[in-house]
């Protein structure tokens, strides 16, 4: 049986940069901010220390979450016109006393997004969620990193 070696910091850093490229493709501002934060974190902990393997593991887990679970929305170009029509309907409803909310127009406009779902995103169906863990008990460790959580029983 071959022993698996932990990735070195450079491998983890490259994996994290690839994950940011996949997750934030087309959004230069967010991509730049994510990469700057990754660089800052790796630069702050440049020297090898006792916690280096834990930090490498954290970077790998962060990259995996970015790659498989982060979906960005893009504002649909025609959303403004439909939001305007929707707003005029709301004004009529408010006048008649049928509606009392305040930021409905803005919420409607903000809700009109197209999601960027790429091939790496985890997909599941509701049946797998409903049946998962029905007969299992899981202890959740509060205040610990994801890699330190243990399931029991």
Swiss-Prot record:
Organism superkingdom: Eukaryota
Main location: mitochondrion
GO biological process, one term: mitochondrial respiratory chain complex III assembly
Compartments in which it is found: Mitochondrion matrix
Keywords associated with the record: Chaperone, Mitochondrion, Transit peptide
Keyword Chaperone recorded: yes
Keyword Zinc-finger recorded: no
A GO CC annotation given for this chain: mitochondrial matrix
GO molecular function, one term: protein folding chaperone
Transit peptide: 1-56
Entry coiled-coil feature ranges: none
Family classification: Belongs to the complex I LYR family. MZM1 subfamily.
PANTHER family tied to this protein: COMPLEX III ASSEMBLY FACTOR LYRM7
Subunit-structure text: Interacts with RIP1.
Main function: Assembly factor required for Rieske Fe-S protein RIP1 incorporation into the cytochrome b-c1 (CIII) complex. Functions as a chaperone, binding to this subunit within the mitochondrial matrix and stabilizing it prior to its translocation and insertion into the late CIII dimeric intermediate within the mitochondrial inner membrane. Modulates the mitochondrial matrix zinc pool.
Protein name: Mitochondrial zinc maintenance protein 1, mitochondrial
